[in-house]
A protein has these predicted regions:
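Prokaryote-biased recognition of long, low-complexity C-terminal linker/tail segments
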Residues: 151-223
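Intrinsically disordered, low-complexity regulatory segments
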Residues: 1-152, 156, 220-237
């Protein structure tokens, strides 16, 4: 669509454009050790950074977390592209997380180049061409970014503090809590306990048998009755 056909390491160029990409969140919020807080100690809680630091995506190793080499390489390529361009066309997903992916990279690389937004929901050639003809000012999505940033920081505050608090209270092991994962796990556990403690009970339903033009069919009520009499009463109403 753009006419950029020259494939390079980490980008594609041509026709006045350089196209590069991110693979997920290349930049995220730093862990507590970046603020000088190491190990799980009760006196450190709650951990409330004055301002959050951005770092490249980390991977866990035997010696702790370290920057992912592929992420660091791609960020270097993106910075080189930013340095070469006059203006940035942001083409990340048209949504909150897509906006956050770009803005965190933009902030981490301390870029000051102006940017506009390609806002499309289809990846057909026509949709892309139409979107390029109707680029939006990047500032139009500042509030979308702020909402994504608030979600990201809230997840950090809840996850870090709750995980450390539970681990300290338990006295051994490391336990992970999160805004999404913990309620989801609670739903799974609740359902498991319901099934485990389930005791079969007798119930009644209404069944209707009817037909038309020699075609017979039956219908079963969604409502279930704990005893027979309420079912009979409802049946009389229907009749």
């Amino acid at each position: 669509v753009l006419g950029a056909t020259q494939k390079n390491d980490g980008n594609i160029s041509g026709n006045g454009y350089i196209v590069t990409w991110a693979f997920g969140h290349l930049v995220g919020l730093a862990m507590p050790d970046a603020y000088g807080i190491e190990n799980f100690r009760r006196e450190n809680l709650p951990i409330l950074p004055q301002s959050f630091q951005l770092i490249p995506r980390q991977v866990k190793t035997d010696k702790g977390y370290k920057p992912d080499s592929g992420t660091v390489k791609q960020l270097k390529i993106i910075k080189e592209v930013f340095d070469q361009c006059d203006k940035i066309i942001v083409a990340t997903d048209a949504g909150r997380e897509g906006e956050l992916i770009f803005r965190y990279i933009y902030q981490y690389l301390e870029c000051r180049k102006p940017f506009v937004r390609l806002w499309i929901s289809s990846l057909t050639d026509k949709a892309i061409r139409d979107g390029l003809q109707n680029l939006k000012d990047g500032t139009m999505y500042d509030n979308l970014f702020r909402s994504a940033k608030a979600r990201s920081e809230a997840d950090w505050l809840i996850g870090i503090n709750a995980s450390q608090a539970l681990s300290i209270a338990a006295g051994r092991g490391t336990y992970s809590l999160g805004r999404v994962q913990t309620p989801t796990l609670a739903m799974i556990c609740s359902r498991y306990l319901e099934n485990k403690n389930f005791v079969p009970q007798k119930y009644w339903q209404l069944k209707l048998q009817t037909g038309k033009d020699s075609i017979e069919f039956s219908a079963l009520s969604e409502e279930k009755f704990d005893s027979q009499q309420p079912a009979i009463d409802k049946l009389q109403i229907i009749k």
